[in-house]
Amino acid sequence: MSQRDTLVHLFAGGCGGTVGAILTCPLEVVKTRLQSSSVTLYISEVQLNTMAGASVNRVVSPGPLHCLKAILEKEGPRSLFRGLGPNLVGVAPSRAIYFAAYSNCKEKLNGVFDPDSTQVHMASAAMAGFTAITATNPIWLIKTRLQLDARTRGEKQMGAFECVRKVYQTDGLRGFYRGMSASYAGISETVIHFVIYESIKQKLLECKTASMMETDEESVKEASDFVRMMLAAATSKTCATTIAYPHEVVRTRLREEGTKYRSFFQTLSLIVQEEGYGSLYRGLTTHLVRQIPNTAIMMATYELVVYLLNG
């Protein structure tokens, strides 16, 4: 791959990530709040009568709409874009690094394995995920802390630089890498996503090629091609996210301020013990509602920018 091709993939990946992040930021804030242990801020208690006549309070987890309403009422609409700054700072380099690493790995591995085989896509996605996570984890930690900073209207909101200073004073440099083990576990989601995406993309390409051969038409990129890419991205991301979602909850807990959570497996075990298995999927609906259009927008933007820059 030439230096120009690498720069094209870097730029296209950055554009795709940025557009997706801006359009889906409110859903990202709601999802992060639902994943957090501080979700009790928005939890109501339901009083139940027992057989003996006594009453007990049962904690009921809030739904996405309940959480959204509570944020709007207590903190105002601007809080739905909390963490957007670090998100934009992080998403462009993260996606750029990811897509450039993915494309480079895929090109090199095509010479080792069968070209564009499942092994190539899996290994490329894993290496790209590892590279992007290691490089950008501090930015995502700050973004998560800002999104969890629930302050009512009128109170001064914590800024990104204040958050950076606070993390460094409390935990030192190591504090910026909290939750990275859960992010590494999440590479499985990336691998599943890209394997399914590339498989669907290949099938769509084969169908189009066969159709072109029958009609003797030249293969030209059309608007319908980008719609198909968006559908392929949405389908693959839905499957991957549903399978690997618990790592998202664990990662959010590890990134919380003053947390009792210390490591990936300790956090996973503690969440199950204290809140049950269902809590590992808290916020999944919101995550899917956000992630599906976000991924579709990101992948379609990426493919479009690569196509335009390559002529």
UniProtKB/Swiss-Prot annotation:
> What is the membrane topology noted in the UniProt record heading this document?
Multi-pass membrane protein
Gene Ontology molecular functions: pyrimidine nucleotide transmembrane transporter activity
Q: Does the keyword Disulfide bond apply?
A: no
**A single GO cellular-component term on record:** mitochondrion
Task: Locate the coiled-coil region(s) and give their ranges.
Answer: none
Q: Which InterPro entries match?
A: Mit_carrier, Mitochondrial_sb/sol_carrier, Mt_carrier_dom_sf, SLC25A33/36-like
UniProt keyword terms in alphabetical order: Membrane, Mitochondrion, Mitochondrion inner membrane, Repeat, Transmembrane, Transmembrane helix, Transport
- The signal peptide annotation in the UniProt record is none
Q: Where does the UniProt annotation locate this protein?
A: Mitochondrion inner membrane
Q: Where are the Solcar repeats?
A: 4-108, 116-203, 224-308
Substrates-to-products reaction catalysed: UTP(in) + CTP(out) = UTP(out) + CTP(in); CTP(out) + UDP(in) = CTP(in) + UDP(out); UMP(in) + CTP(out) = UMP(out) + CTP(in); dUTP(in) + CTP(out) = dUTP(out) + CTP(in)
User: What PANTHER family does the record tag this protein with?
Assistant: MITOCHONDRIAL CARRIER PROTEIN RIM2, SOLUTE CARRIER FAMILY 25 MEMBER 36
Q: Which family does it belong to?
A: Belongs to the mitochondrial carrier (TC 2.A.29) family.
Q: What is this protein called?
A: Solute carrier family 25 member 36
